[in-house]
Amino acid sequence: MILTIDEVLTAEELAEMKDVLATADFVDGKTTAGWHAKLVKNNTQLAGKAACSMDLKERVKSALLRHPLFKVAIQPRSIHTLLFSRYQEGMSYGDHVDNAFMGGARSDVSFTLFLNAPEDYTGGELCVELADGVHTYKLAAGSAIAYPSSTIHRVETVTSGTRLVAVGWVQSLVRDVQQRELLFDLDTARRSLFATHGKTPEFDLISKSHANLLRQWAE
């Protein structure tokens, strides 16, 4: 399941982050890539020892966790290994799959949070390979895309301007993507039913199934 999430960050939060990152120290992105991904990774990222790093990471985590769609669809146990990546002209990240574990946590869901407008750069699309083909994304500033960490994906070459994003990984309470999607569908259905008809016996049955499946699958 690929999920686009609008307005994760407010305009004020975006402006503050971009101001901080504009003067921050960026280093070669290969330093955090796996041994095979280093061959195709060409970007820069906020230095891990940068004074602003911890604060910015906490801001992103808080913004995601307050968003109801993120919580319902992803079922996050923890958000980990956050990076702030910058792609300037000529930079890209070729086909790769994310590591199964990062920082001692399992990577179930990957996300990209866009920090500047798509008009600020050309190229730089995020491409995710699924069974039905390649899906391409270039979202508005403040919006995020979440997708299974098990997929092959890439960032196309930036041909002009600068692409600025926050990327990170989530260990979910429910590791299986199909189970997460089923839980999300049930939750969406019961909320729609409740909005239309209130707390009915049918609503209670769907809620029972949702709760019991989550109880069975959650880790």
Curated annotation (Swiss-Prot):
Name the UniProt record assigns to this protein: PKHD-type hydroxylase AM1_3707
Residues reported in the UniProt entry to bind 2-oxoglutarate: 163
Top EC class, one word: oxidoreductase
Domain Fe2OG dioxygenase span(s) in chain numbering: 78-172
NCBIfam families registered for this protein in UniProt: PRK05467.1-3, PRK05467.1-4
Organism placement in taxonomy: Bacteria, Bacillati, Cyanobacteriota, Cyanophyceae, Acaryochloridales
Keyword Chloroplast in record: no
Molecular function GO terms recorded: 2-oxoglutarate-dependent dioxygenase activity; iron ion binding; L-ascorbic acid binding
Documented EC number(s): 1.14.11.-
SMART domains cross-referenced by the UniProt entry: P4Hc
Binding site for Fe cation: 96, 98, 153
Keywords: Dioxygenase, Iron, Metal-binding, Oxidoreductase, Vitamin C
The keyword Metal-binding is assigned to this record: yes
Co-factor remark: Binds 1 Fe(2+) ion per subunit.
Listed PANTHER family: PKHD-TYPE HYDROXYLASE YBIX
Organism listed in the record: Acaryochloris marina (strain MBIC 11017)
InterPro entries found in the cross-reference section: Oxoglu/Fe-dep_dioxygenase_dom, PKHD_C, PKHD_hydroxylase, Pro_4_hyd_alph, Pro_4_hyd_alph_FE2OG_OXY
